[in-house]
């Protein structure tokens, strides 16, 4: 296996056999369908397991990575050192009044569905974002003029000392694709959003409209991590890339989408290196043509 075999045995005291694996290919866990193995991957089923895992990692100085739905992640071909903590089994959603509370691993589409079923409007923007609520808080995810900062009420997080604390909207410091969670390395375990009462039919119509727009404009038929680049101030990344003649540009199995130039996709059989090489070429070309720096929105992690 790897250098963390002894640590794997320690973690095994907290997990059932099916909830802890070694050398798990990250290509099976992220939307891009690329990436080498995680030394250890755990899927906690309660908060206690999360806290115990974090405490052990910190006590033994073992690196860890928090994984939501894997929709905004690019894992390098060498995989991930240490422990990947995947939150997909922590996905409970509850509603009370105008508030929806979801565990970190709950999918945004399911939170959106819960809001719809309770005639709550304001979360339609997230219906097609393929991430989890924890990841959405982490990066202040958004689409179609909406973002988490518009609806978040509070979040429960685990801080750097493994203490659970409640953060208000203001304390979360949500900015463009950033948050205090990202800056300080906190772990989101639950989030509450506050919405407005609405009519089921109009909420459903908006969800359907946004879904149709997404399907018509984005290359959803290919593995990707969604929008590859952050929006540079005063520009649109996709237009800069298209105007640079890079639509369809490819290296190996990775390519700039023909459908939307802001997406780098896996056409089939891509390696993480292929994707990274395409990203680097796009950044270099746009810089040369327009003197604009493109920064990745997708998180790039792992070993070369």
Swiss-Prot record:
Keyword annotations from UniProtKB, A to Z: Cell cycle, Cell division, Cell shape, Cell wall biogenesis/degradation, Cytoplasm, FAD, Flavoprotein, NADP, Oxidoreductase, Peptidoglycan synthesis
Catalytic activity field: UDP-N-acetyl-alpha-D-muramate + NADP(+) = UDP-N-acetyl-3-O-(1-carboxyvinyl)-alpha-D-glucosamine + NADPH + H(+)
Source domain of life: Bacteria
Molecular-function GO term, any one: FAD binding
Location in or out of the cell: Cytoplasm
GO cellular component: cytosol
Enzyme nomenclature, EC number: 1.3.1.98
Annotated pathway: Cell wall biogenesis; peptidoglycan biosynthesis
Active site: 177, 227 (proton donor), 297
GO terms for biological process, alphabetical: cell division; cell wall organization; peptidoglycan biosynthetic process; regulation of cell shape
Domain FAD-binding PCMH-type residues, every copy: 33-198
One Pfam assignment: FAD_binding_4
Family classification: Belongs to the MurB family.
Function: Cell wall formation.
Family annotation (PANTHER family): UDP-N-ACETYLENOLPYRUVOYLGLUCOSAMINE REDUCTASE
Name used for this protein in its record: UDP-N-acetylenolpyruvoylglucosamine reductase
Source organism phylogeny: Bacteria, Bacillati, Bacillota, Clostridia, Eubacteriales
